[in-house]
Amino acid sequence: MKIAILGPVTTKTYFGGVAVFDEELAAGFKHNEWEVVLITNQKNADSEKNGVPVRMINAISARKIIKEESPDIILASLQYAKYWRFCKENAIRIYFLHGFFNQSYYGKLKSEAASLYQRLIAKQSHYVFANSYFTKMVNDQFFGIQTNEVFHLGVTSEYYSAILNTEVPKEKGAILYTGRLVSAKGIGNLLWAMKVLKDGGMPYKAYIAGDGPDKEKLEKYVAKNNLDVHFLGRVSQKDLVTYYSKAEIFVSLNPSEPFGIVFPEALLARCKIVCPCTGGQVEYLMDYKDTVAFVDEASPDAVANGIERLGKSPVAAELSDKYIQTFRYDTVAKEMIDYLNVRGKNKWTLKN
């Protein structure tokens, strides 16, 4: 069987979570001995990613290229489902939901328009997949988009290999945040929590990896309150592994995180984790309550208490080899293959 994955890919000028998902999932299907192709309208994309061919399309060439590839299954993200009309009639169409368009983050107009588009696409799909039960619930209950199955995401193969083989020791009292520096991500509440801890005689050091529009304001707050916070800006994958490895506690406070790939990254790095009580991460962190603090992310005092509790605990997350494997994309791809084989029953069987 041949699968085409439609969506963005990373380039020298573009990097995004969905692009990474597309490339890693494609490699996962290839590892499971499927024929796979990446199809994108990203300009200046490489001709291959992880050994998977990349076909670049535009409004003129899309029909010709997709017909040439003639995939049996086509999995699309974001607006790329518009190219389904060029697939052969019996191709299986899968739409993958990476989250939801909440008004507080995207604005009322974009949220309503994007959700309407996704509802229309979902009706044209044979299957709709989501990255968490939280994403599934929100899309179903608030946007009228029903999901067939949930598939948790993996980390990149590069990160997976590096983090399991690192020898960087943990730094006592070190906190790590990775992500955009915007209010929706809760970075301000983390810094306010650090002031609470400092005022209580329990100073912590924080490494902030990422950039965003709130950076200048956050830097001024840190300087004014003399907090031990290091703004790293955008960091390379290699450096990110180092910071995850040395961090004792990882903090991320977005209450509406659809999945939160940073949490599996932190878990594999054996970080203790402070996170909200809501979001997709709750589904796979609930089994680690001794090393995870679920907090009211809007309360700096609650965040500070979570950090303090974990900082005093000598316990680190213990992960089984089987559980670690679930964060590999060849495992994610195999789960999708098994799901489709069962749903195909006797009408069609999906084999390599």
Map each language-model feature to its residues.
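A conserved mid-protein helix/loop that constitutes part of the nucleotide-sugar donor-binding site
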Residues: 20-24, 173, 177-196, 213-216
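Acidic anion/phosphate-binding donor-loop and adjacent secondary structure
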Residues: 106, 154-172, 242
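Membrane-proximal helix-turn-helix segments that form the acceptor-binding/catalytic region
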Residues: 111-128, 137, 141-142
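Nucleotide-activated donor-binding/catalytic signature segment of Leloir-type glycosyltransferases, i.e.
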Residues: 219-235
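Short alpha-helical donor nucleotide-sugar binding micro-motif in glycosyltransferases
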Residues: 234-235, 242-247
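Aromatic "clamp/platform" in nucleotide-sugar-dependent glycosyltransferases that forms part
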Residues: 255
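Conserved acidic donor-binding segment of nucleotide-sugar-dependent glycosyltransferases
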Residues: 288-300, 307-313
